[in-house]
């Protein structure tokens, strides 16, 4: 009873923070002609409600794809239609074809913010609460603390309830998938992840860990017996899930091809804006977009991404465990973010939510990563006028993590899950005993640097010669952090002796 009372208070606090952030500005507010993501979501409601399904993804006189054309999978379109249906009942002007372009009002803002709030409340938040309650060998206090820190993660709050998007839907479905797999409900977990993938194609960041974990379970059960049966059931579940989601588009091959072209546009280039990945950071020294063709960029990014995630995926397939699965979700998503093609700054959320899932296991490193991930989106947040919510939610999150997990006391090799690695280095690296102090010092230096850059980005005008000095500095420093975290997570996965002991649980 006490657990659920504390969880209720946690949810109420999380909802209060979300609604408070939603009172602020949003992407593209009062900035014609393109406005921003807020207008994109409103425009998709306009298109899906007023046009037949066969025109949703095609360029027509009523659907100019150059003006926020629909470029997400069918479930996003259906969600937009559902929101539009409600909007029509309240005020038809909000989604009137053509004439509603750029519509802004306080009542419409309230409606749009409410749609995000409801989606969060129905899909993401219940998944977080049930996931934290499902944690084994964990006290009630730790379960509540984990839920509090996950729900107060500022990155997702600022993007969904500030900037304006519905990331909590796809991430929530993915989290439901993880939750189902933790109970060995493999078919339900597969279906939930298919929903996530059919809401946002960026969920491909998580697809390989799901695939490798389930394939590994099939191997362990034996492909001549129960394993083969499970594999057939999983394949059937995936096919059925996709068939249901894509059913209205399956009447015409050209419809399917056009949707796919909209989902995976090659001509947009290697990256957009000042994203904290390796390609954007390298472009400071080498203008990759100018010296390499788009097709070569695509092949290069694919090759580097594949090579970076291959070791952990092989380990997960050979030694499937729930712990290894969650860690591989982090490492694979981070590899995609750092090295893949057409990455947005908001894509770091696809790494952050899996990191949230292990905050009770490695609280120090998880907290550090989540702070950096929020900081990496600073240029976007400043553009949207979200400096105050950024500062307040980040400080609140850091305070919650320090109070809940005493993170500065969790820096030993054992606490950082590095004991197997440190034992393999014993006799070669004499300074490894100083590692806890080094990590704490690096954390404090990192937080100080992020704080100083945040203040300077908001208050100091850059030199005329370097107008992008602060955004580039933010993305480059964040990228260095992410490379460090990629190495760290790969090390604890590849040297994790617990995985082999946990295989019995998935056999």
Curated annotation (Swiss-Prot):
Enzyme kind, highest EC tier = transferase
The pathway noted for it is: Protein modification; protein glycosylation
The protein's annotated catalytic reaction(s) are:
an alpha-D-Man-(1->2)-alpha-D-Man-(1->2)-alpha-D-Man-(1->3)-[alpha-D-Man-(1->2)-alpha-D-Man-(1->3)-[alpha-D-Man-(1->2)-alpha-D-Man-(1->6)]-alpha-D-Man-(1->6)]-beta-D-Man-(1->4)-beta-D-GlcNAc-(1->4)-alpha-D-GlcNAc-diphospho-di-trans,poly-cis-dolichol + a di-trans,poly-cis-dolichyl beta-D-glucosyl phosphate = an alpha-D-Glc-(1->3)-alpha-D-Man-(1->2)-alpha-D-Man-(1->2)-alpha-D-Man-(1->3)-[alpha-D-Man-(1->2)-alpha-D-Man-(1->3)-[alpha-D-Man-(1->2)-alpha-D-Man-(1->6)]-alpha-D-Man-(1->6)]-beta-D-Man-(1->4)-beta-D-GlcNAc-(1->4)-alpha-D-GlcNAc-diphospho-di-trans,poly-cis-dolichol + a di-trans,poly-cis-dolichyl phosphate + H(+)
Top-level taxon of origin: Eukaryota
Q: Which GO terms describe its molecular function?
A: dolichyl pyrophosphate Man9GlcNAc2 alpha-1,3-glucosyltransferase activity
UniProt keywords, alphabetically: Endoplasmic reticulum, Glycoprotein, Glycosyltransferase, Membrane, Transferase, Transmembrane, Transmembrane helix
The membrane-topology field of this record reads: Multi-pass membrane protein
The places in or outside the cell where this protein is found are: Endoplasmic reticulum membrane
- Per the record's keyword annotation, is Iron included, yes or no? no
Q: Where are the transmembrane segments?
A: 4-24, 115-135, 144-164, 169-189, 227-247, 298-318, 339-359, 362-382, 388-408, 442-462, 474-494
Residues with an annotated glycan are 59
Membrane topology (Lumenal): 25-114, 165-168, 248-297, 360-361, 409-441, 495-507
Q: What does this protein do?
A: Dolichyl pyrophosphate Man9GlcNAc2 alpha-1,3-glucosyltransferase that operates in the biosynthetic pathway of dolichol-linked oligosaccharides, the glycan precursors employed in protein asparagine (N)-glycosylation. The assembly of dolichol-linked oligosaccharides begins on the cytosolic side of the endoplasmic reticulum membrane and finishes in its lumen. The sequential addition of sugars to dolichol pyrophosphate produces dolichol-linked oligosaccharides containing fourteen sugars, including two GlcNAcs, nine mannoses and three glucoses.
Q: What is this protein called?
A: Dolichyl pyrophosphate Man9GlcNAc2 alpha-1,3-glucosyltransferase
Q: Which organism is it from?
A: Gallus gallus
**What does UniProt list as this organism's lineage?**
Eukaryota, Metazoa, Chordata, Craniata, Vertebrata
């Amino acid at each position: 009873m006490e657990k659920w009372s504390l969880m209720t208070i946690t949810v109420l606090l999380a909802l209060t923070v979300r609604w408070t952030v939603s009172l602020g500005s949003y992407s593209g507010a009062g900035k014609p002609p393109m406005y921003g993501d807020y207008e994109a979501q409103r425009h998709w409601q306009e298109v899906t409600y007023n046009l037949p399904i066969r025109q949703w993804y095609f360029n027509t006189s009523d659907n100019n794809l150059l003006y926020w054309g629909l470029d997400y999978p069918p479930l996003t379109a259906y969600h937009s239609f559902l929101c539009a249906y409600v909007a029509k009942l309240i005020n038809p002007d909000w989604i009137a074809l053509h004439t509603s372009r750029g519509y802004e009002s306080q009542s419409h803002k309230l409606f749009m913010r409410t749609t995000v709030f409801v989606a969060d409340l129905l899909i993401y938040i219940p998944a977080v609460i049930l996931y934290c309650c499902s944690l084994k060998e964990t006290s009630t206090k730790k379960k509540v603390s984990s839920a509090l820190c996950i729900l107060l993660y500022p990155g997702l709050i600022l993007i969904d309830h500030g900037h304006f998007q519905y990331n909590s839907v796809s991430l929530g479905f993915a989290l439901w998938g993880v939750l189902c797999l933790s109970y060995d409900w493999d078919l339900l977990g597969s279906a939930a992840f298919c929903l996530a993938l059919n809401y946002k194609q960026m969920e491909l960041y998580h697809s390989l860990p799901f695939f490798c974990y389930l394939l590994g379970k099939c191997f362990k059960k034996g492909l001549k017996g129960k394993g083969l049966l499970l594999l057939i059931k999983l394949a059937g579940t995936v096919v059925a899930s996709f068939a249901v989601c894509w059913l209205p588009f399956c009447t015409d091959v050209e419809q399917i091809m056009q949707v796919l072209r909209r989902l995976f546009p090659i001509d947009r280039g290697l990256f957009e804006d000042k994203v904290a990945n390796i390609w954007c950071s390298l472009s400071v020294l080498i203008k990759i977009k100018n010296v390499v063709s788009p097709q070569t960029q695509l092949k290069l990014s694919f090759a580097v991404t594949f090579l970076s995630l291959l070791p952990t995926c092989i380990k997960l397939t050979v030694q499937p465990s729930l712990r290894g699965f969650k860690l591989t979700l982090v490492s694979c998503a981070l590899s995609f973010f750092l090295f893949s093609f057409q990455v947005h700054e908001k894509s770091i959320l696809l790494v952050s939510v899996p990191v949230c899932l292990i905050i009770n296991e490695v609280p120090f490193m998880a907290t550090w990563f989540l702070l950096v991930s929020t900081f990496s989106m600073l240029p976007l947040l400043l553009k949207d006028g979200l400096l105050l919510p950024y500062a307040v939610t980040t400080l609140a999150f850091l305070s919650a993590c320090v109070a809940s997990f005493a993170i500065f006391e969790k820096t030993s090799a054992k606490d950082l899950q590095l004991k197997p690695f440190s034992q393999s280095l014993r006799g070669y690296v004499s300074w490894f005993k100083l590692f806890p102090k080094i990590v704490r010092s690096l954390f404090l230096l990192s937080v100080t640097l992020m704080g100083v850059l945040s203040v300077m980005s908001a208050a100091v005008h850059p030199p005329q010669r370097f107008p992008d000095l602060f955004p580039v500095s933010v993305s480059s420093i964040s990228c260095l952090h992410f490379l460090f975290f990629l190495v760290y997570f790969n090390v604890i996965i590849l040297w994790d002796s617990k995985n082999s002991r946990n295989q019995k649980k998935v056999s």
